[in-house]
């Protein structure tokens, strides 16, 4: 038996049996953790509000060799991020971000840069609400931290610099293509301006989400390119994406009417 503790983000939970709760966390010290909080629904003394999704906590647990679930002992709440529960779009985006981290990173052990990115993302959305910029930045940065950084500034086949205003992108090759190299490859097209915006975003600090203002074309084209890369790497669908897409489309229609 091993006693462990770490700061962690609560990704999600579900009730188990009459009083227990199964909790999935992404921790600073151990990465992805799944544990059982016994009697969590009957007694709030050990956990209180610390098992709420999107919260940052300091969690203590016991693990045993050969068992998938650790036993959660108690937790200290660091940041509840209560603002997310008053904004449906922000909450949906937070849920998507947490699920994306779980699916893309998986059980690969400690990944401090991913932990820092996730906490910065959740804090930003908690204070500023959901936005397409925040989603695009999270997706792009997660791809990079997971080893799938898109090749943007030169043709990924011939290495040439881009001279035309339109650039092709092949998710299957993981990067951009000049127009001379698109034969026989399934591609998407985006403007050189959009490509440059994505490249500049990758140079910014991982935890920085404020101050980004992408044009509508960059959001659309960049979002399509990043989504195609995510589909290449994810082994299962992101369930929360459907609800987030419904909310995002609804918000866009309302904005168009105003």
Swiss-Prot record:
Keywords: DNA damage, DNA recombination, DNA repair. It comes from the Bacteria. InterPro entries: ARFGAP/RecO, DNA_rep/recomb_RecO_N, NA-bd_OB-fold, RecO, RecO_C. GO terms for biological process: DNA recombination; double-strand break repair. The keyword DNA repair applies. Pfam families: RecO_C (PF02565), RecO_N (PF11967). GO terms for cellular component: bacterial nucleoid. Involved in DNA repair and RecF pathway recombination. Belongs to the RecO family. This is DNA repair protein RecO. It comes from Syntrophotalea carbinolica (strain DSM 2380 / NBRC 103641 / GraBd1) (Pelobacter carbinolicus).
